[in-house]
Amino acid sequence: VGFKAGVRDYRLTYYTPEYKTKDTDILAAFRMTPQPGVPAEEAGAAVAAESSTGTWTTVWTDGLTSLDRYKGRCYDIEPVAGEENQYIAYVAYPLDLFEEGSVTNLFTSIVGNVFGFKALRALRLEDLRIPPAYSKTFIGPPHGIQVERDKLNKYGRPLLGCTIKPKLGLSAKNYGRAVYECLRGGLDFTKDDENVNSQPFMRWRDRFLFVAEALFKSQAETGEIKGHYLNATAGTCEEMLKRAAFARELGAPIVMHDYLTGGFTANTSLAFYCRDNGLLLHIHRAMHAVIDRQRNHGMHFRVLAKALRMSGGDHIHAGTVVGKLEGEREVTLGFVDLLRDDYIEKDRSRGIYFTQDWVSMPGVLPVASGGIHVWHMPALTEIFGDDSVLQFGGGTLGHPWGNAPGAVANRVALEACVQARNEGRDLAREGNEIIRERSK
C-alpha cells in the first residue's frame, strides 16, 4: 500500500488551535518572526514539529508509533502589539518526550535544533511552564533559602557579598588577604570572579587554602559565620568534584559554579554533591547575555532561571535594575519571584506567560551584582527585599581607605536601610539621608 512521501505543510499536523492543554504538558511561549511569505500558523507549527517529533517529510516509521500521543502542538498564536510580522506561538509538549531530571534533555529537545530553521527570521523562547509532574523529578536547590539562613544564623536582612578585584592577577596569598579584609569589615560573603579557576598566577588549591585561613580568622574576630564562593568550575566534571571535595575538607560552607559555561549536566552533578555534603552552591550566569540579550532571538533569562532552579543552585546572579548591567525592573522582579516563590501567577506585564507551581521545591536567593555601590542600598533593599544577596565588588574595594572600611560602609548602610524600612520610613525619598545619619 505504501504511504505518500514528499514535502508536507507542518500546519496540517502540528497546528491544533482546538487543543486543550493538560496539567502534565510542558508549555512554551516562543516569540517568532517568520520569513516574508511564511504564514504565522505554518511557522508556529514548524516550531512545534521541529522541537518534538517532526521532520520535513512523511516517513514510513511514522506508522510505527502514535504521533498524536507524542507530537508537540502549536495551540495558539497571537500577534505582538506594536511589532510587524512578530507573533507569540504557544506550544504544548507531552511529558513523555523528556527524560526525568534532565535539564540537558529538556533544552536539547525544545531549543536544540529549531532556532536555525530557515522559515524563521528570528525565534526567542520567552517562557516555559514546568508542570509539577516534571519538576518533582529534579533535585532543585541543594539546600534553599531557609536552610541557608539556618546554616549561617542570619535572618531579617539581605546578605552582603563582594567579588574580589582585580579578578585576575593576584597571588593566592594576596587574594586571601583581600578576602580577610572584606569579611572582617562586616560582609557575609566574598566571591571568586567567574573566570577565576586555576591559572598559572594562582592555582586553585593555593587559593582555597589561603581563603580558608581568611574565613576562619575573620569568623574568630567577628563571631559571625563567613563564606567565600570558591569557584569549583573546571575542565572536567571529575576535576570540578575534586575541587568541591577539597573545599568541604577545609570546612568552607559554599562553592561556586559557572552553570552555563560548565553545562547543566555538570551543574546537576555538583548540586547532588553539595546536597549530600552540606555545601551551599552559588551559581554565576557567565555567558547568559550571549543567549538572552537579543530581544527577538535566543532565550529570555527567566527560562534560564527556571532551568537553574531545577538543575540546582542556592544563589544565582539576577541583575540589579540599578547597576551597570541591563535589567528592567518589573521583568527582573518577575524572574526573581520565579526563583524564590512557590507559586507565581501569570502576569504578562512582568513577562510571566504561564502560572508556575513549584510545589515544595526550595527557592533560590537572587544575587544583585554589577556596578552597584553604597548609595544604591536604599533602592536595592526596597527592590529585592530580605531574601537576596547584595554584592558590591568595586563598591567595596573602591573605598579610598581600603577593603575593610568599604565593607563597614556597606554593612552600616544596609542595617540603616533595613531598620528604616522596618520603621515605615520611605527609602525612595529618604534613603540617602538615612545613610548619612547612620554614618556620622
From Swiss-Prot:
Heterohexadecamer of 8 large chains and 8 small chains; disulfide-linked. The disulfide link is formed within the large subunit homodimers. Its main location: plastid. The disulfide bond which can form in the large chain dimeric partners within the hexadecamer appears to be associated with oxidative stress and protein turnover. The keyword Magnesium applies. One of its GO terms (biological process) is photorespiration. Mg(2+) binds at residues 191, 193-194. It is found in: Plastid, Chloroplast. This is Ribulose bisphosphate carboxylase large chain. GO terms for molecular function: magnesium ion binding; monooxygenase activity; ribulose-bisphosphate carboxylase activity. Binds 1 Mg(2+) ion per subunit. It comes from Onoclea sensibilis (Sensitive fern). Substrate binds at residues 113, 163, 167, 285, 317, 369. Its EC number is 4.1.1.39. RuBisCO catalyzes two reactions: the carboxylation of D-ribulose 1,5-bisphosphate, the primary event in carbon dioxide fixation, as well as the oxidative fragmentation of the pentose substrate in the photorespiration process. Both reactions occur simultaneously and in competition at the same active site. Keywords: Calvin cycle, Carbon dioxide fixation, Chloroplast, Disulfide bond, Lyase, Magnesium, Metal-binding, Methylation, Monooxygenase, Oxidoreductase, Photorespiration, Photosynthesis, Plastid. Its cofactor is Mg(2+).
